[in-house]
C-alpha cells in the first residue's frame, strides 16, 4: 500500500505531468513563447480555468490566421458568443464594473459586454488583424423595440475595412455580424483601442491626443494584458 506521503507525491507528479502536457500542446499550436504561455496559464489556473479552454482558444487563433477577413471575424465572434455566458461583473468579480483580460474571461467562462468585446479585440489582434481596423465602441443600446426610448450602456467591437468605411459590428447580443447601418438600436458615444480614443466614434484619422489615459479601466486592463504576455 502506498503511504499518504507517497500518494501525495504520485498525485503531485501526475499534476505536474498534466501541466507539462498542456504546455507542450499549446506550444505546438502557436508561435508565442513558452514564457508567455506560462504567464497566461498561470492566470487561467488562478481563476479556476481548465487548460483545454486555453488550448481551444489558441487553436482558434492559429486556424483563423490564414482566413479571409470575413471568416476571421465570424469565427472569433461565434467562438466567444458560444463559449462565454453573459453574467454581470458583480456576480463574477464582486465588483460593479471590472474589465477582464481575455484569459480571465476564458477562465471564468462568464462576462459582460465589455469582457466579450475585449476578448474578441485581443483575439483578432493575435490572429493577424491590425489595430487600425478595430475599435471598441461604447454605445447606448435601445431596449424594447424601435418605438422605445429606454437605453442602457453597452459595448461592441467595430471592424473598419478602411478609415472611411462603414464599420461591421461584433456584438454579444446578436451573433450575426451586421453593418452599423443595420444596428439602428445602437447609438455610439465614443470609441477607442490601444492607440487612443475617438471622442466622435464615427470619425476617422488620428485619435484624441489625450490617449488611453482618459479611460482608467482600459489603461489598467492594458497593463494586466501586457503582463500576461499579450502584444498590441
Task: List each model region and its residues.
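A structural boundary/capping signal
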Residues: 2-3, 31-232
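Bacterial N-terminal signal peptides that target proteins for export
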Residues: 4-21
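Mature extracytoplasmic/luminal segments of secretory-pathway proteins
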Residues: 8-11, 27, 110
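Bacterial N-terminal signal peptides
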Residues: 21-28
